[in-house]
Each structure stands twice: as structure tokens, then as C-alpha cells.
Regions:
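Bacterial N-terminal signal peptides that target proteins for export
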Residues: 1-9
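C-terminal segment of classical bacterial N-terminal signal peptides
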Residues: 15-23
Length: 225
């Protein structure tokens, strides 16, 4: 199921990467709403959802996103950036980590590095990039590389606000790492206006993954702690 979800999200992002028009110069509008998040067992869930709009391109900002390595976790485990922006991976743990990805938009292997060291990676292509640690199988994160800067992290209550959206009809998406399927809707934005749209998403369990060699993690990975 994870492969299907990732493929659908990747197609949604990548399909606009080279064909989308530049953002319009006229004043943008505001898109607000709520994402209802439910676990697969029907229980309500906290946020940790990225909401984004596709259909147009914007240049990247100068900012560098950060995914920290703390307590054998990636923090945060979901970030959104614009094409050609960078992500920094600082290690705050007193042991080695090895950050890598086998995702088609950006395959990379940062190698092993110790506490106090930070490595960066740029992301020149749109898509969904799943990131793991080759030493600790419990570590997983996702980077959404998007064609524009109209993206945001929904609040703990699922509410979101997207400012400066160009006038027009666009697709709006809600993405969660453990979603059983992607969710999207059409949204029409008017210059200087506000549009409300609500979305719903269902999440499942964290899927298993392979190490950077395409193999299962060894049972004795605790020796690397």
C-alpha cells in the first residue's frame, strides 16, 4: 500500500514540475480549511500533515530546512520544500547515523557521521523522497519536494492557512507519511479573496523498509547504538 500511495503522490507532484506555468503577478488569495485525520482503526489522530497546492511554479527561497537526528528519530519526520532548496541533517545523538534515500527524485547516501556533524543535500527535482538511517531501522522521514512555496504544515487541530496563492483553479493536496491513500480537491482562488476547503485523510501503520543495499536490516542492529 505504501508504494501505491507514494507513486500517486509522486505523480501528483512531478506532473506539474515541468509543465506548470509561473505564478501570476496579480495579488494572490488565501486558502483556509481543516484536514480531518483518522487512523485506519477509526480513531481520530493528531496532525502531522502537509497541505500544498500544485499547478504553478515558483523560485525557491534561500532557507534550508532541517531534519534533526535525535533519540534515534528524525525530527520532524515530514517536511516540505520547494524545488532546488536544501535540507540539513544534524546529528544530535552520541552515536553514528547514516542518512540515505533510494527514492527516484533524489537518491543519495550521506555516509556515517557522528554527533555534532551536519550534512546537507539539495533537491533539484519535484517528488516524494523517503529518508532512512542505514544503522537504525526505526528511523524514517519524508521530504516533499514541491514546485512552489504554497505549502504548510497543518496545526495540531488540522487547521491550515495558505497565503498568497495565485488566482486560478488549482489542485490542493493533504499528505501524511502513513496515509492509506492520498487526498485532494479542486480549489478556485480569486485575487484578494479567501477560499475554504476541507480535506480528510486516513493513516495506517508505519511500513517496513530495506536498508541502503536493498536488504533487510540485521536483527542485531542494536550493536550500533
Amino acid at each position: 500500500m505504501r508504494a501505491v500511495v507514494k507513486a500517486a503522490a509522486l505523480a501528483a507532484v512531478a506532473s506539474v514540475g515541468s509543465l506548470a506555468a509561473p505564478a501570476a503577478a496579480e495579488p494572490g488569495g488565501r486558502v483556509v480549511g481543516t484536514v480531518k485525520i483518522t487512523e485506519a482503526d477509526g480513531q481520530p489522530a493528531a496532525a502531522d500533515v502537509i497541505v500544498y497546492i500544485t499547478g504553478f511554479n515558483e523560485p525557491p527561497s534561500d532557507k534550508v530546512a532541517t531534519i534533526s537526528q535525535k533519540g534515534r528519530k528524525f525530527v520532524p519526520d515530514l517536511v516540505a520544500i520547494t524545488v532546488n532548496e536544501k535540507v540539513a541533517f544534524p546529528n544530535f545523538d552520541p552515536f553514528l547515523h547514516n542518512v540515505f534515500s533510494q527514492s527516484l527524485p533524489r537518491k543519495f547516501d550521506l555516509g556515517s557521521f557522528p554527533k555534532g556533524e551536519t550534512k546537507q543535500k539539495d533537491f533539484p527535482l519535484p517528488g516524494v523522497v523517503d529518508v532512512y538511517c542505514n544503522i537504525h531501522p526505526e528511523m524514517a522521514a519524508t521530504i516533499l519536494v514541491l514546485p512552489n512555496r504554497r505549502h504548510t504544515l497543518a496545526g495540531p487541530d488540522g487547521k491550515f492557512v495558505l497565503e498568497g496563492v495565485p488566482p486560478g483553479e488549482w489542485n490542493i493536496f493533504a499528505y501524511s507519511r502513513r496515509a492509506t491513500k492520498p487526498t485532494s480537491a479542486k480549489v478556485t482562488v480569486k485575487a484578494g479573496g479567501e477560499t475554504t476547503v476541507d480535506l480528510a485523510i486516513v493513516r495506517g501503520a508505519e511500513p517496513a523498509h530495506l536498508n541502503k543495499y536493498g536488504e533487510k536490516y540485521k536483527d542485531n542492529v542494536q550493536v550500533y547504538k
